Amino acid sequence: MTTANRILVLFCLALSATLAVNAQDDPRWAVVPNINDLDDWNVQPNSPALAKAIGDAAEYVLRWKAPGSAEDWRVRRPQVERGLRKSLGLETLPPRTPLNVRSVASDDRGDYIVDNLIFDSRPGFPVTANLYRPKTRTAGRLPAILSPIGHLIDDGKRDTEVQARSIKLARMGFIVLSYDAIGHGERMTSGNTHHEGGYALLPLGETITGWMVWDSMRGIDYLLSRPDVDPSRIGITGNSGGGLNALYTAAVDDRISVVVIVGYTFEFNNWIKYGGAHGTCSYLPGLFREMEWFEVAGLIAPRPVLMLNGERDSIFPVSGARRASNSTKALYSVLGHGDLARFYAVPEQGHAYSRPYREQMYGWMAKHLLHEGDGGPIDEGSVETLAEDDPRLLCDPDERLMLAAPSVVELARRAGNTASDDLSAAPAAKSRDALRAFIQDLTAPPEPEPHNLMPIRVERSEREGEPEKVYFLSEIGQHIPGLLWVPPAGTPTARTIIVVDEEGKGAVAESDLVEPLRRAGNAVLAIDPRGRGETLGHMGNRTNNYHLISISMMAGRPLAGRRGFDLTRAVDFVARRDDLPLDNLTVLGRGDDALPALLAAVADPRIKRIVADRFVSSFVSQMIPAHLPTRQQLHREWNQSLMRRGKVSGADYTIDLASVIPSMLRYGDVPEIVSLLADRKVLFANPKDGKTRNGSPYPRRLERLTSSQDLTVTQEPLSADQLKEWLAR
């Protein structure tokens, strides 16, 4: 080949490669040009922090394997049960207080009767329910079925699919109790939605899911109080959130003898990666660290369980349902009961409890509770339901009862106040040691040996006052970007101040704090801990905040604690730099990121001064209802806004749910955390709960500490001058 030919061939190859690259990047051929336009159900997001959290959680849950023998399960089962009860917040069951059952209406429908009932699952906490029962009485007692409702926000138990299955079951000879879930149907009132109520309960060590399960357990109590119900024949079935309720209730209450789970069968490992974001009830603290889904279902064994999932279900993908059901069936087989666990992927069906699902359920219930048939589908026949807005199914038509009843948030605040008071009265040494250990666990490194920081200077400007752009690795896969400002040339660096802000380092850069602090001789390092600023990312019209919070919590790594760890690594970064003094190191946390600053200071004695700006003075103040005057706004907030932002906006202030730590109030409130820093200087400025409309008692508890430690509490907004004056003390 001549030299000219070689040159021509190389040119053609280069041109082909260029055209291929251009074709690959050409937006004309892109189906979804922007990944942010995709829905978040089945797509891993473009968030470094969330990708890291998902990867870690999925890796951790892989350790849970199906038992190889009945003996293996005998050993493993108590561990799973303890872990599940702990995650649900049902380690100790609430007292079984009087149900106070009220029958408010009865509707004779010919061959069946519908009673409208209200019972109290807790004192003053009403549950609205419909009881479907056969009109013709037979000799002996009848089997009963609990029918918990999923996320049917407006219609609840009046949904036509709920009515249809209840009517058919009553005609088959069952007594059926359908009841509104907390925050749904007639119980959808301010302070009861799963996001508001769920996050209000977490600091107490309780969950909205545990409360839903307790509603179901009290529903069983009611059924067993009826002379026409056979206590040995109790079934439960529900879809989506109702399937969740059926699964967990059956797992912890062996009075249930038959289970049908619809639209809630999934493998945790699969769902973590591809399941997207869901309601708060799906996220149980630390569950991924305790078990896989099939092990929860294994707690039901050897009772019969039917798992139904639509082939077109986009919320709980059928691939994960098949994996989970295969593992569940394998566990049942190991125990010698392989025929009592069945899975069916319903063709052409999405996420619902439509007729094809119901007919499968009828056959399963008939076989195991009526001792009829082989468990195959039973035709539903003709079923006439009421319109979903028909008032005949309402228990509280004028809403007087529900509006007068305390909400989950109100009840959580009452319990929170009691817990906080008890903490302040607890023996100091014992409670302080327990709190310190709890915080050390929250902020603990993921591995015994720290990962290499790999600090990198991305960009350094020669212009006066411009920040240096840096980043380092907090742990493998978790990069922390930062902006570093140094004092003017010729001015010695007096101290280093690390700043975190709930709005990210960009908010610090645009604040009026940096320049005065820099000119006063301070180096200022503003970082984005995981899930802040550029590490957060978006998916569609949502930030990834809520999804990141939820995955981190289920993995047993609450985000505030992980951000506290990131701050201790920022201290490591400062220690690596010869130009940044470590003496008198100060950490400033703004908004809800004041909590990671406090946690980091408890964990790391190298932090000598701590500033908490615009945080709450008590974790009870995190328990707030969304400020939404109308039911329509409440519906929209439940289903959209909270999941888009991961925040609750109350009448006086907003809470970022990332600052909510499960079981926190079992160990300490904000004043107790501050008291652990008695050997350091602390400035607590402008607490967001200090100027509420109705006043707040919590800042006063914090102020009482000023007599025993170097603590400054001010209700005024933090200014650069105030901060400089405090730093000079």
Kindly give the residue locations of the regions a language model identified:
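Short beta-strand element of the alpha/beta-hydrolase
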Residues: 129-131, 139-150, 493-502
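Bacterial N-terminal signal peptides that target proteins for export
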Residues: 1-9
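Short amphipathic alpha-helix adjacent to the substrate-entry channel of hydrolases
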Residues: 159-177, 509-526
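Bacterial N-terminal signal peptides
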Residues: 8-18
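Gly/Ser-rich "nucleophile elbow"/oxyanion-hole loop immediately N-terminal to the catalytic nucleophile
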Residues: 136-140, 194-239, 256, 541-591
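Alpha/beta-hydrolase-fold serine-hydrolase catalytic core, especially in secreted/extracellular enzymes
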Residues: 24-127, 137, 301-303, 308-481, ...
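Primarily recognizes the serine-hydrolase "nucleophile elbow" in alpha/beta-hydrolase
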Residues: 152, 219-289, 570-676
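Glycine-rich "HGGG/HGxG" loop immediately N-terminal to the catalytic nucleophile
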Residues: 183-195, 270, 531-546
